[in-house]
Amino acid sequence: MSSIIQLLPDHVANQIAAGEVVQRPASVVKELLENAIDAGASDIKLICKEAGKVLIQVIDNGKGMSVTDARLCFERHATSKIRQAEDLFDLHTKGFRGEALASIAAIAHVEMKTKQDQEELGTHIIIEGSKFVSQDVAVLPKGTSFLVKNLFFNIPARRNFLKSDIVELRHIIDEFQRVALAHHNIHFTFYHNGSELFNLPQSNVRQRIVNIFSGKTNEKLVPIQENTDILSIQGFIGKPEFAKKSKGEQFFFVNDRFIKSGYLHHAIMNAYEGLLRDGAQPSYFLYLDVPPHTIDINIHPTKTEIKFDDEQALYAILRSATKHSLGQFNVAPVLDFERDFNLDTPYSYQNKEAETPTIQVDSNFNPFQEEKKQSNFSYKPKTEKQPHWESLYVGLDTKSIDLDEMSFESETVTSSLFSDSEVEKAPTTTYQIHKKYIVNPIKSGMLIIDQQRAHQRILYEQFLTNITIHQANSQQLLFPVTLYFSGNEMALIQEIKQSLESTGFVFEALNKDSIVISGLPVTVSESEASIVLEQLVSDLQQEVPDSSFSQMDSMAKSMAKSLAVKTGTYLTEEAQVNLVNNLFACKEATVSPFNKTTFITLSVEDLDKKFSI
């Protein structure tokens, strides 16, 4: 019987390995940037076209490679970073597995140019799908240039799974920002489709953060520093009042490597307890230095998860350092805001203002005079004549009432009180329960409406109509409003600018890290502008639909969610009636934009069952 187990060809094995290393264009960007850093580069350029699907190029001024190394670097498990297994627990470089370049070369067209400083000529290599096409010498500057074209050209199924350019570009920017924040001593530039998105000169940590996330970020930062035997912490945390609903500006770096840790994030959130609004997320840029032998990086293909020897100690130190920084810079409250101070004041004095007492001095007073001598000073307390108690009963008939002579006709009273004619003439009235539900009587029973979901449905259909027909009304602002966003967010706003204008936004200018708004949709107040746009950008960053209609739909949903009346908001009776009427004027009144029930009906039969009638 013939054997059925066979060794896979190298190019097939490389494609399988590429599935773990290269998931999308951002994965290629991450690997190439880290290789440039390991090469000792002080200047790194990143160039992309069509969100990396067509072209990704990384150019550095590092030490370069020899002719032999240039060819060997594309072999699997070929690396200059480690020599033995023990080196995995004493890592000082970004890469160490030696499979990134082999994986990239297996699923793309790769062109590499490299030259060492002491060499006169460099090496030029072209590889297509793991196959060496050519290797030549060339006149090159010191450093290395990797050009990756047509990603997943030989795996159509993987290419079809890529998201829209906006989404893929967002992932690339995320990776670029993480690397740039971890290495503020390196000059980074990033170009996309010929436009410069980032130009980050060498600087300190604070300036690097400001250069990436706009100038307004500087006033939001609180420095943090702590040094212990097992952990050193440096960086910045955000002031609570600037916390957002999204988790965009949260970064942990361990030994200059970006990581994700829900455990350490919980320590930060614990330190902010009582300082944040519900659902708000603080920003933080924290650099943790630990001995390399106390962590294990080799547990995840992307190296974003790390195993610590003593997580509990790190948790306690990080939480304590964060609380200390918040208190040191007068961010943490010094009063207990949950205490009801009205309990300290007698009820009868709660609404009274303090009065300065009047002091009268007797100039003739002599303590050595005999007590029998009367002073000229006299004090007469002010008295008011109280009405005689009998006046309380003036006008009352003193004649006794004979209860026996009174008759009660309960049936007659009941029938007149609830007569059919009066019930029909009574106006329809709405009631608000717990500032959450609106109850409206109907012929068959009662209608119970969720006010937040109902308002979301109303606003959603209004915004969707305005976006579709491009006839939204705008309110012009007397003074333009400037809002600041990160580079990642600004790239997204540039892409959806036309759709935003169709909702009623009027942009006076779109700068590198800010926008100037001169007009708003009629349903958006000036104070709500930043909230609406932040929520919109946050929602679209999660997943930007490919089709234009789906993008409009997502925008309408996001704006409706931001502007809808919230649970816990008191509504006047007029507002309740308007909400009910507008809800049933919608095309899909039964559900919210997020497919949640907007109202339920409770019939008379249901009420009878409750009362066991």
From Swiss-Prot:
- Which PANTHER family does the entry mention? DNA MISMATCH REPAIR PROTEIN MLH, PMS, MUTL (PTHR10073), DNA MISMATCH REPAIR PROTEIN MLH1 (PTHR10073:SF12)
Q: What top-level branch of life does the organism fall under?
A: Bacteria
Under PROSITE patterns, the record lists:
DNA_MISMATCH_REPAIR_1
**Any GO molecular function:** ATP hydrolysis activity
This chain's protein is named DNA mismatch repair protein MutL
InterPro entries linked to this entry: DNA_mismatch_repair_CS, DNA_mismatch_repair_MutL, DNA_mismatch_S5_2-like, HATPase_C_sf, MutL/Mlh/PMS, MutL/Mlh/Pms-like, MutL_C, MutL_C_dimsub
The UniProt transmembrane annotation reads: none
Gene Ontology terms: biological process: mismatch repair
Q: Please provide an example of a Pfam family that matches this protein in its UniProt record.
A: DNA_mis_repair
List, alphabetically, the CDD domains matched.
HATPase_MutL-MLH-PMS-like, MutL_Trans
The entry's cellular-component GO terms read: mismatch repair complex
Q: Which UniProt keywords apply?
A: DNA damage, DNA repair
Q: What does this protein do?
A: This protein is involved in the repair of mismatches in DNA. It is required for dam-dependent methyl-directed DNA mismatch repair. May act as a 'molecular matchmaker', a protein that promotes the formation of a stable complex between two or more DNA-binding proteins in an ATP-dependent manner without itself being part of a final effector complex.
- What is the originating organism of this protein? Flavobacterium psychrophilum (strain ATCC 49511 / DSM 21280 / CIP 103535 / JIP02/86)
Q: Where is the signal peptide?
A: none
Q: Which gene encodes it?
A: mutL
Alphabetized HAMAP family for the sequence: DNA_mis_repair (MF_00149)
Family note = Belongs to the DNA mismatch repair MutL/HexB family.
